[in-house]
Curated annotation (Swiss-Prot):
Organism: Vibrio parahaemolyticus serotype O3:K6 (strain RIMD 2210633)
Protein name, per record: Large ribosomal subunit protein uL13
Any one Gene Ontology BP term: translation
Database matches in InterPro entries: Ribosomal_uL13 (IPR005822), Ribosomal_uL13_bac-type (IPR005823), Ribosomal_uL13_CS (IPR023563), Ribosomal_uL13_sf (IPR036899)
Gene name of this polypeptide: rplM
Subunit structure comment from the entry: Part of the 50S ribosomal subunit.
UniProt function note: This protein is one of the early assembly proteins of the 50S ribosomal subunit, although it is not seen to bind rRNA by itself. It is important during the early stages of 50S assembly.
Alphabetical keyword list: Ribonucleoprotein, Ribosomal protein
Family (UniProt): Belongs to the universal ribosomal protein uL13 family.
CDD domains found in the cross-reference section: Ribosomal_L13
GO cellular component, one term: cytosolic large ribosomal subunit
Length: 142
């Protein structure tokens, strides 16, 4: 018996919608990353993008435990000398609530072209509305 290897053109991708309200950030992000990779499917192949499309709503209502709201800091650098910027979780969730979940999921995906292709299938919205009704997404309880 030969080992099954999925081909990119034969992979069937579904659309799912996830409500992030009250969910813990890391637990939610790890499940979303796993689904974006396609690890929940029997035909999972590491070098093929077999994951589904994930729409996340209510990203502004995601929860963190402990004092992480005040203590968790996100860093970025402008590549200029002295260009290190930082922002706390509290400020980032107020300014760009989608970015918190996007950064958490992106850090759990592989680096390189395949990881970027997986990341493009993630759609995050701060509120309860999304504009992917035409794709008829199924509700996914995580």
């Amino acid at each position: 018996m030969k080992t099954f290897v999925a081909k990119p053109e034969t992979v069937k991708r579904d659309w799912y919608v996830v409500d992030a309200e009250g969910k813990t950030l890391g637990r939610l992000a790890s499940e979303i990353a796993s689904r974006l990779r396609g690890k929940h499917k029997a035909e999972y192949t590491p070098h093929v993008d077999a994951g589904d499309y994930i729409i996340v709503i209510n990203a502004e209502k995601v929860a963190v435990t402990g004092n992480k709201a005040k203590d968790k800091v996100y860093y970025r650098h402008s590549e200029f000398p002295g260009g290190l910027k930082s922002i706390t979780f509290e400020k980032l969730i107020d300014r760009k609530p989608e970015m918190v979940l996007e950064l958490a999921v992106k850090g759990m995906l592989p680096r390189g072209p395949l990881g970027r292709a997986m990341y493009r299938k993630l759609k995050v919205y701060a509120g309860a509305e999304h504009n992917h009704v035409a794709q008829q997404p199924q509700v996914l309880d995580i």
